[in-house]
Regions:
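Bacterial N-terminal signal peptides
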Residues: 7-18
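Preference for solvent-exposed, low-hydrophobicity sequence contexts
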Residues: 23-366
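Substrate-binding cleft of extracellular glycoside hydrolase catalytic domains
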Residues: 434-495, 499-500
């Protein structure tokens, strides 16, 4: 029997080795789409060209990269003008890195790449130019059915003409438009292929079709969803950065067979992109998606939603709605949290992310541990007296929440000009990064850890392993009526915190959700025992042994001198010697400038590393019962 098992093991080992060897021999196809960045998108034809190429490419990538990394594109530029796709490719192309020695074949024409992978795809899903939401339905169907998405357009140079009517003449397996180009979804009568009455909305009927034909039948993977703008983008492609069509972001979610949507979270007005619809219809369908995902995930697994409200285009005052940008962000978070879903927040400005279906195969280490400070070390460094009391010497201690790194696209785009800045490491910084981003950009997360200095420490970003509002996990859950999601959240977060050596949650956005109650605090204490920073809490609190400090000011000024003014003024007003400040996308040199300025002004304010800050704060709470009990208030 032992000999038999040895032979089986040997055969399996040889088989696995052959697979790995075959993968290493299989060249990576690299499609260069950089010229699309130069198109004049004020011309309708150019905007359509960009949209069509990026959409078909992303759905193709999602299919062919599902099981191994085979197709890479060059396209996304960050705000500094640097090509992000080239940056990451070149980093891991170096000797000894993951892509070193891998053969490549370069392409400039999408049709050539489609020909290469023709046997990998079953055909095409064709969608309707006149019904914007069908583009998102096409991405959903593409992943489930192994189809590439192509917009119906019979003009001579369109992709539809070049791939379906001519060229390879790919078979159309799913029509989201009639074959003559007239709309399949009309907002009248019954919804095609379902027997369901029309909602009266051109936008919503395709979503109902998808829910009936695919979602309710269990055909898509409800652990993943994608919240990206639909074809409405083509109405004004230059309203913000031109890569905010975010079609590049589709590939990962296509590979996961996710469902795609672009819906308003507001129930008190029609969606701004569909003003004649019944008030709150978008929200109704959003809840249907989330409820069905919760049901299929059995309330045990969370739904990972990539994306963010496209607030400059839809659902806010920018688009003629009632609500402000942040309010819309928070309302979307509040709603999805009620159904055990969180978002990976690809927000406008830095929201484009390519090649995640490729990078998802990047090999991570088993664990990335971080060391916590000991009391002996605090004594040796002069922060703790021998009797266990804190050696303040008149000092106030501050900590920066270095954010916002709750988005895969944001950390991929900002690494070249923020993380790589030469001054990083000169002052202690608490880099607050959501560990769930390792799903889409593991190469970024790995790079952070292997290039970190002793002054770089990592905490989880808002609000743990994903951006949701944890108060909406607590019972009673008025939006959804579901049972508590706290135990599922603790289980979900624990896996990521353990892998990445995290014990601090650097910020908890409560927004318009309830604050954490005792059960919510117990939940966080189970995976974030060394500290949390919520919004709706007393100024100070010790929950069992977990230190809790209420979130305070955002420091937004780009001038570090004026930023220092705000910090000094705030520290003088606060009644406790521990202070948390949040900053968004600030450079290491900005933080160093503040520290230098504090010293030059001879203030008593000192920036600490995260373990020292939270451990001293815990000691302080234990030695000050009123502070531990949450009885300290602002004057």
């Amino acid at each position: 029997m032992r000999k038999y098992l040895q032979l089986v093991f040997l055969a399996v080992s040889v088989f696995c080795s052959e697979i790995l060897f075959a993968e290493s021999r299989d060249p990576v196809r690299i499609l260069d789409l950089r010229t699309l960045n130069e198109l004049d998108l004020k011309e309708q034809e150019k905007a359509e060209q960009l949209w069509d190429i990026m959409h078909t490419t992303a759905t193709l990538q999602g299919i062919v990269n599902r099981n191994s990394p085979r197709l890479y594109i060059r396209y996304v530029k960050n705000g500094q003008g640097e090509n992000v796709d080239d940056y990451w490719w070149n980093k891991y192309r170096q000797a000894g890195q993951w892509l070193a020695g891998r053969d490549t074949i370069a392409y400039t024409e999408l049709s050539d790449v489609v020909t290469v992978f023709r046997k990998e795809i079953r055909g095409v899903v064709v969608y309707d130019s006149k019904v914007a939401s069908t583009s998102n339905i096409a991405s959903s169907v593409a992943g489930i059915e192994n189809l590439i998405a192509v917009r119906y357009d019979i003009s001579p140079n369109s992709l539809y003409t070049r791939l379906v009517l001519q060229g390879p003449k790919l078979a159309v397996k799913c029509w989201l438009v009639n074959k003559d180009g007239s709309s399949l979804f009309t907002g009248k009568g019954r919804i095609a292929g379902t027997g369901q009455p029309s909602t009266g909305s051109l936008k919503i009927d395709p979503y109902v079709w998808f829910i009936e034909k695919y979602l309710k039948k269990g055909l898509c993977n409800t652990e993943y969803a994608a919240y990206y703008i639909d074809q409405f983008w083509r109405t004004d492609p230059t309203r913000t950065v031109t890569n905010h069509h975010q079609l590049t972001n589709h590939d990962f979610f296509v590979s996961k067979k996710a469902f795609f949507f672009d819906l308003s979270p507001w129930g008190d007005e029609p969606a701004t992109d569909d003003p004649t619809q019944e008030e709150g219809l978008d929200l109704q369908i959003l809840k249907t998606f989330l409820q069905e995902a919760y049901k299929q995930n059995k309330g045990e697994k969370f739904c990972y939603i990539g994306g963010f409200p496209s607030w400059i285009y839809k659902y806010t005052q920018h688009a003629g709605g009632k609500h402000e940008d942040v309010a819309t962000e928070w309302e979307f978070s509040r709603i999805i949290s009620a159904y055990n879903a969180f978002k990976d927040a690809d927000a406008i400005g830095l929201g484009a992310l390519a090649n995640s279906s490729f990078w998802q195969h990047f090999p991570l280490q088993e664990k990335y541990p971080q060391k916590w400070v000991t009391h002996q070390e605090l004594m040796d460094r002069g922060y703790l007296n021998r009797d266990g009391t804190i050696n303040f010497q008149g000092r106030n201690f501050i900590l920066f929440y270095v954010g916002d790194y709750d988005s895969s696209s944001w950390i991929a785009q900002t690494t070249p000009f923020l993380w790589d800045e030469p001054s990083r490491g000169e002052v202690p910084l608490m880099w607050s990064v959501s560990p769930v981003l390792a799903e889409r950009v593991p190469m970024v997360m790995h790079n952070y850890r292997v290039t970190a200095t002793p002054n770089d420490y990592f905490a989880a970003a808002d609000n743990g392993a994903g951006y949701l509002m944890p108060g909406m996990l607590q019972e009673p859950r008025s939006v959804s009526g579901l049972k508590s999601g706290l135990s599922a959240w603790a289980k979900h977060c624990s896996k990521y915190y353990q892998k990445w050596g995290l014990t601090i949650t650097g910020f908890v956005i409560d927004g318009e959700a309830p604050g954490l109650d005792s059960d919510g605090l117990d939940c966080y204490a189970s995976f974030s025992p060394n500290g949390i920073v919520p919004q709706k809490m007393p100024l100070t609190l010790l929950h069992n042994d977990m230190p809790v400090i209420r979130a305070d000011y955002d420091i937004v000024d780009h001038d570090y001198r004026r930023a220092t003014d705000v910090i000094v003024e705030r520290v003088e007003k606060r009644p406790v010697p521990f202070h948390w400040f949040r900053a968004i996308l600030k450079s290491p040199s900005w933080y160093k400038g503040i520290c230098d300025e504090l010293k030059q002004r001879h203030t008593n304010i000192e920036l600490l590393d995260a373990p020292t800050f939270f451990e001293l704060y815990r000691i302080y709470l234990k030695q000050h019962p009123d502070a531990a009990a949450g009885k300290i208030t602002m004057n």
